[in-house]
A protein has these predicted regions:
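Rossmann-fold dinucleotide-binding core
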Residues: 96, 101, 105-171
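Glycine-rich phosphate-binding loop and adjoining beta1-alpha1-beta2 segment
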Residues: 1-17, 28-29
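Short acidic low-complexity segments
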Residues: 20-32
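Long, compositionally biased stretches enriched for glycine and/or charged residues
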Residues: 140-329
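Flexible loop/turn segments at secondary-structure boundaries
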Residues: 30, 47, 110-113, 134, ...
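An anion/phosphate-binding loop that grips the pyrophosphate of nucleotide cofactors and donors
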Residues: 35
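Flavin (primarily FAD) cofactor-binding/catalytic cores of flavoenzymes
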Residues: 39
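Rossmann-fold NAD(P)-binding glycine/threonine-rich loop
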Residues: 44-119
Length: 329
């Protein structure tokens, strides 16, 4: 069925390329043989039962989560059940496509990408769309859409917690003073849902890439059993993610059935990095991404060398080349 949909998409784009279908672990080497790029987007254990267990077991012991896919109990459990599968991927790739790039979209991003980079010989870069949507979402929330065009930014840190270190308009003017002048009104709005990240700006001076929903569980400031009023004050959606998954899966099934029945008439390129990386390497056309790579060259000087960091990377015919950032504030 997936092949039928892909063939429909291929025809919608003029019929270029060739689609081959391989099903099952026993056919994986044949699928990988001679590949230049391998895109990884998997969930080991699926939503049911594993995501449910990731939430329900910690909850019994008073540990509350919002997403549970990055760190903490939920993130660690995801990593532990996914790393063995990634190790099998890596072993096959080292044998049948040793020069291929492994483009990883699977969470927990830093743990899994870091594993591949530290313990396998596979060229790996981790990809997350929170970098390219970061400043645009912030500007739209603050009514600063007029500053979107031509803006210049620097984002670096670790996945889901990289920092908008610099943000300037097309003329090079620092936009943080204007941003900071607008955030108190938003934080005071009881209906506004992005308060945690705006609090970061107030207290730390910088905005963070991933959502307030994610960031609420990354530190000790917001989800506290002795201060339940913080949940309401910051609009923190505890246990919302499992419910959202149910609705999302139902929506995907409906969309899948419609594509299978009607075909795909139109397919537009998104801002996800994978296709741009492949195009840049094959055509030697420069492109910049935010990638998750090892900090072995001290790209961020005050994070450990063995850490997996999210930094600007130049992509061209030579591959993915991480850029030096320096120290985080």
């Amino acid at each position: 069925e997936s092949r039928v949909i892909l063939e429909s998409m291929r025809k919608a784009k003029g019929g270029y390329g060739k689609i081959e279908c391989y099903v099952g672990v026993e056919n994986r080497k044949d699928a990988l043989r001679g590949a230049n790029f391998v895109i990884n987007a998997i969930q080991v254990g699926l939503y049911d039962p594993c995501t449910i267990i990731d939430f329900e077991v910690p909850k019994k012991y008073g540990l509350r989560q919002t997403i549970g896919d990055t760190l903490g109990i939920g993130g660690i459990m995801r990593a532990l059940r996914t790393i063995p599968v990634m190790a099998d991927f890596a072993a096959d790739m080292e044998e049948v496509c040793p020069d291929a790039y492994f483009l990883n979209y699977t969470n927990p991003m830093a743990m899994l990408s870091g594993y591949m980079q530290r313990y396998t010989g596979v060229k790996t870069v981790g990809l997350c769309h929170s970098v390219q949507t970061c400043s645009e979402d912030l500007f739209k929330q603050l009514g600063m859409e007029d500053k979107l065009e031509g803006r210049k930014e620097l984002i670096a840190g670790i996945n889901h917690m990289a920092w908008l270190l610099e943000i300037k308009d097309k003329n090079g003017v620092d936009l943080y003073p204007e941003i900071k002048s607008k955030i108190d009104e938003k934080i005071a709005d009881p209906e506004f849902g992005n308060k945690v990240r705006l609090e970061y700006i107030k207290n730390f001076g910088y905005y963070c890439t991933e959502s307030s929903e994610h960031n609420a569980e990354y530190n000790m400031f917001y989800i506290k059993s002795k201060y339940p009023e913080l949940i309401e004050r910051y609009n923190i959606p505890l246990d919302e993610y499992p419910r959202r998954c149910v609705n999302q899966i139902a929506s995907w099934k409906k969309e899948y059935a419609e594509m299978l029945e009607k075909g795909v008439k139109e397919h537009n390129r998104s801002n996800e990095y994978a296709s741009h990386i492949m195009e840049s390497i094959v055509t030697s056309t420069p492109y910049q991404i935010g990638g998750n790579v090892l900090n072995s060259n001290h790209l961020i000087t005050n994070l450990p060398a063995e850490a997996c960091v999210e930094v600007p990377c130049l992509v061209n015919g030579r591959g993915v080349q991480p850029c030096y950032v320096g120290a985080l504030p």
